[in-house]
Structure formats: C-alpha cells, structure tokens
Amino acid sequence: MASAVQKSALLLCGDYMEAYETIVPLYVLQSFGVSVHCVSPNRNAGDRCVMSAHDFLGLELYTELVVDQLTLNANFDDVTPENYDVIIIPGGRFTELLSADEKCVDLVARFAESKKLIFTSCHSQVMLMAAGILAGGVKCTAFESIKPLIELSGGEWWQQPGIQSMFEITDCVKDGNFMSTVGWPTLGHGIKLLLESLGGKVCSLEKKQASVLFLIGDYVEDYGINVPFRALQALGCKVDAVTPNKKKGEVCATAVYDLEDGRQIPAEKRGHNFFVTASWDDICVDDYDCVVVPGGRSPELLVMNEKAVALVKSFAEKDKVFAAIGQGKLLLAATGVLKGKRCASGKGMKVMVKVAGGEAVMEKGCVTDGKVVTAASATDLPAFLFDLSTALGLTVMF
C-alpha cells in the first residue's frame, strides 16, 4: 500500500503486555507503510518482551495466558517524541510497572505536550493518569475496573451503550489527540480511527464494499485470524468468520505458536477465544469477494468436513479471491485451488503444496499468483495484508 508521506509510530512495550493489542496495530500499521519502533525501558533493540493473552474462559475475571515474545527493534533511550506521529500503549500488567517509571511517564507527557496522538487500550490508561493528562475532563474509556481511577484523575468516563456481552463490544472514543479503547475486541474500529487520525485515506478501485469470509475452527492460529480480520474491518470491508459446527456468537479456541529456545519447531499455546460472526447456514458465496483460511490446526478439522470443502469449491467455481496463511493452504490444496500456483511456504507445508500441484516458494514470506494470496506463516502478516488488500482493490494513502 503506497504512502505519499511516511508516518511513524512508537509502540511502548513491557513484559505481559496484551498480545492482540500489541501485534494487531504493529502488523497493520507496518502493512500500510507506517514505520513502527518497539521499545521498552531498560532494554535495547534485539531484546524481547513476553506477551500474554487476556480473555474470559468461564471464570468471573479474565484469565492471563503467556503466549509468546516480541523482539524490540529500537532503543528506549534514543526515543524523541518529535520523530513520531503517535505513541501506542497496549494493555496488560506491564503498565503498572511503567506507570512508576519516571522516564516512561515523562515520555507520555511529552507526547501530550507536543499534541501527538496517544492510543491506549484496556489498562494502559493508567499511563495517562500517571502523566496527569486526564485532569480537566478528558473523555476516556478502558476496562471497567479502571473507571473509578479515570474519574479520580479528573477524566470523564465513557462507555459504549447497550453492551450485553463481549461479542457486542466494538467502539472506542477519541478526545482531542487522545484515543482510548476498552481492549482488543474494539481493534477493528480502533485501528480505523487511528488511520484516520494519522491522515490515512482508504481508496478502493471498486464501487461496492469489499466482503471477506474467514473459514475457521478450534485452534485456528490466533494472529492469523485476528490481524487480517481487524485490518479488513478498519478498511471498511464487510468481514465474517464462520465454522461448520458453531453458530453466530459462539467461540473458537485459538492457538499461538512460539519458537522457544532450543526447540526444533514452535510450541503451541492456548490463545484468545474468537467469536464466530455468522451461522454456517446463512452463508451465501455470492455475498463475498474472497475467502481466507488462516493457519493453526483448524484446517485439519475443516478439510475433514464436507461442507467446508464444498464451500471452498463453490468459491473456486465463481472465480473469487483465495487467501491462506501457513497451514491454511491444506484446505486450498484439498479443493484443487493450489494446482499450478506459486505459494509462499515454510518447510512444514512444502510437501503438501507440491502434491497439490503447486510450486512451494520458500524464499518469500508472501506470494500472490493470480487470485491466490498465500503467506508462509503468521510472522508474514504485514506483507500478506498488503497483498490481500491489493487483490481486493484497496489502498491506504497518507
């Protein structure tokens, strides 16, 4: 996605930061040509921060699950607010530590003084309190346990009306140069608002709204579903996620794959839940321009389901756009979509692509061949989002 003006973002990180609230803005902004520096106090480029998934798993309060790590790409001590257009602070427990760090609090205050954008999520609004930014009635939202602290800090609490469940949480709020969200369920709208606030304009070659269907199941790759799903929402696309044996409002468990030190292959860890947004029987191929199959282990479930295989074949018969990430290529292989196509592939999918009649491209993280867009793994999502958006006729200009 071409950008006439280079934009830059600073991502303030720390151990146990919320994984979605870190990875989604990082990958989405990178795919749109925004430079993103990831920093953490007392750590340098090349060091890593632990990330966690936070979700409600049947208990009274959310559960925190350690999922993987993010490698920093810049040094905290080199940061100058004037070099950035926005600072993004994910949620997570790390903000409790950073709110007592004078250098971090001063950094946030300097962004505010410079009238730079500040984007907070879930619990990271504590950084605004520490910097004295909310005094004077700044409108703000957050995870509800933060409400009394926002009000005690002189802020004005805002909450999306009519919410009965997490499935219905979609909105966020902006007051001046301050953007706040209740957490990762609102990232579609939050990223849209962030792009607009950075001067981004979504341009489409098509007159009608692009529509995309994600095929998922239990143990779908966490970032492989959430990052493109939220990104396409931010671009104004109609986006649905379905699975054969669950109805709208039910959830699929996700998995994160973390390459731990000394291991030959990544370890699988439980990630967030992902809400199914439509019931299978309500899906009509004619309503969508593209079908996306994320990776993880869910493609093994889908390839054994006749309804899922038949649906993909119906997309093929109507010459739609196909996209797959990692193991998602398994379902495309079983339906003949990969025959004669060049496909981005890691080592684990090389044989599968070959027996399906495709050409495994090992040296590129993302490949587009005609109407088939493939990514080798979830780490290739920035390039994948660029290629998928291009295939849908969408660009973002700053």
Swiss-Prot record:
A Pfam family recorded for this sequence: DJ-1_PfpI
Keywords, alphabetical: Repeat, Stress response
Domain PfpI endopeptidase, residue spans: 7-199, 210-393
Induction: By ethylene, abscisic acid (ABA) and dark.
CDD domains in UniProt: GATase1_PfpI_1 (cd03169)
Assigned GO CC terms: Golgi apparatus
Stored InterPro entries: C56_PfpI-like, Class_I_gatase-like, DJ-1/PfpI
Tissue and organ distribution: Expressed in roots and cauline leaves.
Top-level taxonomic group: Eukaryota
Stretches of the chain forming a coiled coil according to its record: none
Database matches in Gene3D superfamilies: 3.40.50.880
Protein's job: May be involved in oxidative stress response.
Family named by the database record: Belongs to the peptidase C56 family.
Subunit structure: Homotrimer.
Name assigned to this protein: DJ-1 protein homolog E
Name of the gene encoding the protein in the UniProt record: DJ1E
